[in-house]
Amino acid sequence: MKLLSVCAIALLAAQAAGASIKHMLNGFTLMEHSDPAKRELLQKYVTWDEKSLFVNGERIMIFSGEVHPFRLPVPSLWLDVFQKIKALGFNCVSFYVDWALLEGKPGEYRAEGNFALEPFFDVAKQAGIYLLARPGPYINAEASGGGFPGWLQRVNGTLRTSDPAYLKATDNYIAHVAATIAKGQITNGGPVILYQPENEYSGACCDATFPDGDYMQYVIDQARNAGIVVPLINNDAWTGGHNAPGTGKGEVDIYGHDSYPLGFDCGHPSVWPKGNLPTTFRTDHLKQSPTTPYSLIEFQAGSFDPWGGPGFAACAALVNHEFERVFYKNDLSFGAAILNLYMTFGGTNWGNLGHPGGYTSYDYGSPLTESRNVTREKYSELKLIGNFVKASPSYLLATPGNLTTSGYADTADLTVTPLLGNGTGSYFVVRHTDYTSQASTPYKLSLPTSAGRLTVPQLGGTLTLNGRDSKIHVVDYNVAGTNIIYSTAEVFTWKNFGDSKVLILYGGPGEHHELAVSLKSDVQVVEGSNSEFKSKKVGDVVVVAWDVSPSRRIVQIGDLKIFLLDRNSVYNYWVPQLDKDDSSTGYSSEKTTASSIIVKAGYLVRTAYTKGSGLYLTADFNATTPVEVIGAPSNVRNLYINGEKTQFKTDKNGIWSTEVKYSAPKIKLPSMKDLDWKYLDTLQEVQSTYDDSAWPAADLDTTPNTLRPLTTPKSLYSSDYGFHTGYLIYRGHFVADGSETTFDVRTQGGSAFGSSVWLNESFLGSWTGLNANADYNSTYKLPQVEQGKNYVLTILIDTMGLNENWVVGTDEMKNPRGILSYKLSGRDASAITWKLTGNLGGEDYQDKIRGPLNEGGLYAERQGFHQPQPPSQKWKSASPLDGLSKPGIGFYTAQFDLDIPSGWDVPLYFNFGNSTKSAYRVQLYVNGYQYGKFVSNIGPQTSFPVPQGILNYQGTNWVALTLWALESDGAKLDDFELVNTTPVMTALSKIRPSKQPNYRQRKGAY
């Protein structure tokens, strides 16, 4: 700790008042921390001006993808995701941390194994990816409770406010998680360059103080006190200016906001609502935070999907490649310097970690699928945009202008937004004025260039903007010292390979394009056809015009080779950095970008490095693929692909070419229906001999829950007793007086929940669920009861996660789970005494490896039978495909072996038949991890991907199912299969399985 001088204390006071330290560099104002102790650490690492961040003194555009490590509980797969994001041209990943998974019991912070952050930091560094850390404490994220642990329902204070009880509840978590993040900061050699306190702190109701500077300052101070010294950034839910620099107490260093402009209506994926394209972001930014780089911390890259929704394939169609072309280029038109796409890889809501508004899959329609595939066209389109930005540092120096329908394009049907450089290059973003238009619009452009104002095309013809498309036309674009006066075709990338320069341009089908280059040399077509191609020299300028074709053309002008491609062809090109060795990939910088090569190779290129006289590529293939290397270093002679020396040819343009043969292995998967299934009745609670004396008594006279007063004599809110996840079971005991004829009960489990009720062994009925219902009131007719006899009501509730808490003051997260009210006809409610259970131990959860949310309250779960090697030898043999003949819950377990060949990434899925018969619910456990909740009558999910590492691809696996029949005729699985999709020949390192502890008898299990 440093003793602060009087001046330093004055600076701290200035910071509290909203001041900042400024100095000038190359005409731009750099902003640094006003705390000199922190500035001493930061000034050479992460600073910023009004244009962009500087990292290690270099101006950098942050192009980032959102990834949640907790949604992929196989740390050895994180590198795969990072490398696929790096291949997009991105340089950063943003991540949330889910508090509920790390502090399942108040005061006990556990971040080990799959939940440890350090391995995430390590692989980010290995992949050359910076990190934006977003640990909350509130994260939203479509996570149960918005990331809040269930025990916060008992906190006597308003959440996300400066209420002392809430602040105290957050202290332990933030102290630990922020300290871990601090160790991973760039100042300590780690990848973390930004930290976000809180999340979408943007609105309030219900008399909550908002914005509450004291609250935000407390969250900021928590982080700083734990060692966070990187700049703090926020994500306002809209352009509200909350907590922007200069707003006073609770202000962040860099203001950012979110935007989901297309909304979440995946049921109508082709509908783009009128007026949803942002047009004022630049103006808003200049009003709210003109001294910081324009930052979009969450911009839409997909959509959530509710229970009963159309499915994530429809969400991927809604936020598709066309969306990316129009909306992301629109973001660039505002001068976005920090752009994070939510989600870039979604993952899975395994182990009950999701909120009630979503199901097991968190695919999100993202560029990377839930199973980590990169087969969606939107991934390829995003790669074009990402690599363009990476190759265009002058973009950050250009000043965004006002959009206009006149002055640049010759038709008002098009809108142009200029980003004008001062001798450093300009960019013109063109879109349809009606952004929803699907028309093909011809146009010409009037462009201000270093050669004067030019109307293009100059050599005849017109340009075309197809429907739901957008283009970035460059002017005075620097390609290693060669000035591209203009190009109407879009830039993918360019490289300087010493003796030659390469520029890759592309256009859409049926388009005509033109470029002008400041060179005196003649034009040569060195590859491809001369047809539909023309050129003309005008003084010291060469003008080239062509029609886009699927066949590649290479045009040479002096030492510049220009590749003219169509969009679908350029999807197969990659720009890996050329690393020094195979141990890690450097962070994106001017140097590493300049050292990159260009590879045409189909599915995926991960890395490239040189060793001795060899060029080594690591790449994945899903088909026999021609491979080309453009710009191989002059000192290498040999080519290795995935470690194998590969013969190649060199053409007249110096391009290496070879072919990688693909022959998919035969993947033999076990038949699920033919496994040796063992069966156990897992609703033993309805048996007349069942003893619940070991169960917790629901005997609280009051509830600490401040949201909803009790409407029962004793609290029946599950979180009051430490049960926050999965299935709940209640047992209500009463002595009949003979007057009881009906039982009315209101249960609450969240959207799409279900419940069933028994009186002794008599099934009374079920609420089978609807997405629209978070709670439901049911009335059941009782069989004849005998006066003086003991009876037990057994109520089973499937909880779907806790509500999020997005609006401050609502305390929605405190919406209880369990029984809200009940009425036994003819009796006072106090005539029933209750017991309840959820997962064994509640907050003293048994399975520290799989975490506090993974298992619920069924008998088999409480015993741990869902784990590998349960004591099933003497259990009955029965199959879930035969199922149950009456209401209840069956537990089925079986083992099987897999022998998936190494060197292949083979996505595996458990598929359920889509039944239209009686309603039932299934939980899928794989090697102890709950990896699926299937609800037959609601859907939409029927296919559940389970990653390698949860599944043992070379070894023994255990699968367990809980089958809950909600209706009187029972239920069975129509079908249940393990299937694979296309095997990918991969360079991915060996996958280490996540820990899968076997069954051990649990002390105190009931």
Swiss-Prot record:
Please classify the protein's predominant subcellular localization into one broad category: secreted
Glycan attachment points: 156, 373, 402, 422, 622, 760, 777, 914
The reply on keyword Secreted is: yes
Q: Name one GO biological process term.
A: galactose catabolic process
Citing just one GO molecular function, the answer is: beta-galactosidase activity
- Residues forming the catalytic site: 200 (proton donor), 298 (nucleophile)
Concerning InterPro entries, the annotation shows: Betagal_dom2, Betagal_dom2_sf, BetaGal_dom3, BetaGal_dom3_sf, BetaGal_jelly_roll_dom, Galactose-bd-like_sf, Gly_Hdrlase_35_cat, Glyco_hydro_35_CS
| Alphabetic keyword roster | Carbohydrate metabolism, Disulfide bond, Glycoprotein, Glycosidase, Hydrolase, Polysaccharide degradation, Secreted, Signal
The positions making up the signal sequence are 1-18
Q: What reaction does this enzyme carry out catalytically?
A: Hydrolysis of terminal non-reducing beta-D-galactose residues in beta-D-galactosides
- Name where it's found: Secreted
Indicate what this protein is called per its UniProt record.
Probable beta-galactosidase A
| Upper classification of the organism | Eukaryota, Fungi, Dikarya, Ascomycota, Pezizomycotina
What is the gene name? lacA
